Amino acid sequence: MKYKLLIYGIMAAMAFCTTSCYSDFDEPAPAKVWTDADFTADGGEIITIKALKDMCAGVGLAQYKEITDNYIIKGKVISSDQAGNVYKSVYIDDGTAGIELKLMVSNYVYYQVGQTLYVKLKGLAIGNYRYMLSVGGIPSEKDIAKNYANRNLDTQVERDAHIFMGELGQLTEENLPVITRENYKTALTDEYLGRLVRFEGLTYKEGNFDGDRYPQYLETVYLNNATEATYTNKYFKDEGLTPTYAYNYQNQRYYGSSLFTYDATDETDKKGNLIVRVSGYANFALDALPQNGATGAITAIYTKYSSKSGGYI
C-alpha cells in the first residue's frame, strides 16, 4: 500500500508543478519552416537539381565530386521508407530532375511526401554508384575500397548542417512524369533517373531479358562466417514457391526482381523492358505477382542498377 501511495504522491506533486509552474517546455516552439530567403541572405545560390547533375556529368563510376561552392538545392520529397522498400534514403524532385539524399534515419517520420527539403551542398559529395548520382558525405577509405562513391549522413549533427525542412505540400504533375506505350521510346531518358515516374500500360512478363530470367530473387548468404556475401539468383517456381515481389521466409529476406514490358517480343529493348526490384523487407514483399500477360500501371522511382534500367516501387 505504501508503494501505491508513494506513486500517487509523486504524480500529484508532478501535476501540481505542471499547473503552477508553467514554462516554455510545456509548449515547444514550432519547428522553423525554411524558405529561399534563409539561404540567399547568407550568400547561398539555389540551383536546380538538373544543374547539379549537369555539373557532375563527368563523374565516373564509384567516383565522386566534392561541392566546394555555397550551392543549395531544393525539391519535394517523392519517396517514403514506410513500406520498407527505400532504405536510409530520401529522393527529392524539383520538376527539372530528381536525386537521392543518403541519410540514416527512418525518413517517413521526419520528411513527408510533398514536403520541400533544402540541401546545403558545400562539403558534401555527389557520388556515382552503379550509374546513379546521389548526395552524401565524403567517402572514407573503407567506403572507397568497397566502391562506394559517398556515404550516409550518419549523425544528426551532419543532417542538421545540411538538410533543412521547408513547407509541407503536395506532389504535382511536374513531379510525376507519365510514360506510356506510345511515348516511352522518345520520352524515357536518363534525365528521368531518380524521379518518380508513372508507367502506364505495362505488361507483366515471365521470361528472359538481357541474359536473365524473371521473376527471380537474389539469395544472399555468408558462408563459413565469411565477411563477403555469396549471391545466387534463384527462381520462385524452381523452388516450389508462388512468384512474389520479393523473398521473405523463415526470417530470410532477399531482393526480388520481376519483368514488366512495353514490348514483350523484343528482349533487347532496354527502354521497353523494366525490372522492378523489391526488398525482402518491403511490406508487400509476399504479394503475388500478376498473372503472366496482365497489364496495368506502376508508379516507381526510375533507376539504373549496373547497366540495367529498372523501377523501384
Name what the model sees in each region.
Residues 22-87, 91-313:
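OB-fold nucleic-acid-binding modules
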Residues 1-5, 23:
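Positively charged n-region of N-terminal signal peptides that target proteins for export
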Residues 6-14:
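Sec-dependent N-terminal signal peptides
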Residues 16-20:
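C-terminal motif of bacterial Sec signal peptides marking the signal peptidase cleavage site
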